């Protein structure tokens, strides 16, 4: 029997942002409604995709997404092995906006957890998502699909690590208190940086960000003082003019590394001409990101090989699952037939008689099941149908 899984969804590849916003499912209200509409299913809803996975016909899932203002051209529908293959590609990071990004694996895990909490899973979906999560872990541990920085903030951290190796003894100055500064500090804190100095035009914003990451806050007038204390400067402030020029960096005993990720730039390019200063800008970081993306692309065939192996493993499990269903039905049928044939027999005799009756059928099912998965109707399906009519 063909695998009865289905997937209905939309993603950054098929729908613009405003459509994805309409389709996104809030976990408190909209997600339970979606699972209720599906009966049994798992919903994966992120900023870049909303996908409904279930067993049987995809029509209810399709109707649910259309009811949220999605038009048919934005949807994709996959069934059987193709639905499972898509789930595996998603969990491995191959279908992400940035190939190999790690966040999606946690989102797949969360989707399964929420479906379980609603009582919306069943055996095929459980196995599909459990195997997808295991595959995602293998893809990241056995290939380089998740290696290297592919965001500007992480590329800046990679550059700092390449220069210093250990960040624990460093004083790092961050210019700006916006989203990019926050993202960089998140990465920085995870690597155990020694001292964080946050400088911003509005000192209150600097204080709020510094408190989050255990740093010190300064207003813009204190920038010259901060520069004298820093080993590394990362600039991401919104400013219409340069905040740091050659005149702000008098000669010093140890070199100063500066990474300018602001646009417009915060640091005068002439700073890079100073013998004691090493300046990197967005173009330098973009080259790092592009190189890492090319390296990840080279790992895709390895991940696809893992996916095909996982598909084979799942289909082998599914063959056994179908046989187990048929065996249970056969055993129940055999007990009924034995009781009809020997109404005076006791429980032990009836169980033995039922076993003798069912045994040859069970052996035949086990021999033929694996050869039939995904092809024409299996012997066990015919038996299940016939037994349901007796």
From Swiss-Prot:
EC class: oxidoreductase
**Source taxonomy:** Bacteria, Thermotogati, Deinococcota, Deinococci, Thermales
Q: In which pathway does it act?
A: Porphyrin-containing compound metabolism; protoporphyrin-IX biosynthesis; 5-aminolevulinate from L-glutamyl-tRNA(Glu): step 1/2
Q: Which family, according to the similarity comment? A: Belongs to the glutamyl-tRNA reductase family.
Assembly and interactions?
Answer: Homodimer.
Q: Keywords of this protein's UniProt record, alphabetized?
A: NADP, Oxidoreductase, Porphyrin biosynthesis
Q: Enumerate the Gene Ontology biological process terms.
A: protoporphyrinogen IX biosynthetic process from glutamate
**Other remarks?**
During catalysis, the active site Cys acts as a nucleophile attacking the alpha-carbonyl group of tRNA-bound glutamate with the formation of a thioester intermediate between enzyme and glutamate, and the concomitant release of tRNA(Glu). The thioester intermediate is finally reduced by direct hydride transfer from NADPH, to form the product GSA.
Q: For site (Important for activity), what residue positions does UniProt give?
A: 86
Q: Which reaction does it catalyse?
A: (S)-4-amino-5-oxopentanoate + tRNA(Glu) + NADP(+) = L-glutamyl-tRNA(Glu) + NADPH + H(+)
Q: Which Gene3D superfamilies match?
A: Glutamyl-tRNA reductase, N-terminal domain, NAD(P)-binding Rossmann-like Domain
Q: Which InterPro entries match?
A: 4pyrrol_synth_GluRdtase, 4pyrrol_synth_GluRdtase_N, GluRdtase_CS, GluRdtase_N_sf, NAD(P)-bd_dom_sf, Shikm_DH/Glu-tRNA_Rdtase
Keyword flag Glycoprotein: no
What is the recorded function of this protein according to its Swiss-Prot or TrEMBL entry?
A: Catalyzes the NADPH-dependent reduction of glutamyl-tRNA(Glu) to glutamate 1-semialdehyde (GSA).
Binding positions (NADP(+)): 176-181
What is the gene called?
A: hemA
- Residues bound to substrate are 46-49, 96, 101-103, 107
Tell me what this protein is called: Glutamyl-tRNA reductase
Catalytic machinery residues? 47
In short, the EC number is 1.2.1.70
Q: Which residues form a coiled coil?
A: none
Gene Ontology molecular-function annotations = glutamyl-tRNA reductase activity; NADP binding
According to the UniProt entry, the note on domains is: Possesses an unusual extended V-shaped dimeric structure with each monomer consisting of three distinct domains arranged along a curved 'spinal' alpha-helix. The N-terminal catalytic domain specifically recognizes the glutamate moiety of the substrate. The second domain is the NADPH-binding domain, and the third C-terminal domain is responsible for dimerization.
């Amino acid at each position: 029997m063909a695998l009865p899984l289905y997937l209905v969804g939309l993603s950054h590849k098929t729908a613009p942002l405003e459509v994805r916003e309409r389709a996104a499912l809030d976990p408190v209200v909209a997600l339970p409604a979606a699972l209720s509409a599906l009966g049994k299913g798992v919903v994966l809803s992120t900023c870049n995709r909303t996908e409904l996975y279930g067993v049987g016909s995809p029509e209810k899932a399709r109707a649910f997404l259309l009811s949220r203002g999605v038009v048919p051209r934005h949807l994709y529908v996959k069934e059987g092995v193709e639905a499972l293959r898509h789930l595996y590609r998603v969990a491995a990071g191959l279908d992400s906006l940035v190939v190999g990004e790690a966040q999606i694996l946690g989102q797949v895990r969360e989707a399964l957890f929420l479906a379980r909490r609603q009582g919306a899973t069943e055996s095929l979906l459980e196995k599909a998502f459990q195997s997808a999560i295991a595959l995602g872990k293998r893809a990241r541990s056995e290939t380089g699909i998740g290696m290297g920085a592919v965001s500007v903030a992480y590329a800046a951290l990679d550059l700092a690590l390449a220069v210093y190796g250990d960040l624990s003894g460093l004083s790092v100055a961050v210019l700006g208190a916006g989203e990019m500064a926050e993202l960089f500090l998140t990465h920085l804190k995870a690597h155990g940086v020694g001292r964080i100095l946050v400088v911003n035009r509005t000192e209150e914003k600097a204080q709020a960000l510094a408190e989050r990451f255990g740093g010190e806050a300064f207003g813009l007038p204190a920038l010259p003082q901060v520069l004298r204390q820093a080993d590394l400067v990362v600039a991401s402030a919104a400013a219409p003019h340069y905040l740091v020029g050659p005149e702000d960096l008098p000669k010093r005993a140890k070199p100063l590394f500066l990474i300018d990720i602001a646009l417009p730039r915060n640091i005068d390019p002439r700073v890079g001409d100073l013998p004691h200063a090493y300046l990197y800008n967005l173009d330098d970081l973009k080259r790092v990101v592009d190189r890492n993306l090319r390296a990840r692309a080279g790992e895709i065939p390895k991940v696809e090989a893992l996916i095909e192996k996982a598909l084979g493993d799942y289909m082998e499990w599914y063959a056994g699952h179908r046989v187990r269903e048929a065996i249970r039905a056969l055993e129940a049928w055999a007990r009924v037939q034995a009781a009809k044939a020997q109404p005076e027999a006791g429980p032990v005799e009836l169980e033995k008689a039922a076993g003798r009756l069912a045994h040859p059928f069970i052996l035949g099912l086990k021999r033929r099941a694996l050869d039939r998965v995904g092809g024409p109707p299996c012997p066990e399906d015919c038996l299940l149908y016939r037994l349901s009519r007796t």
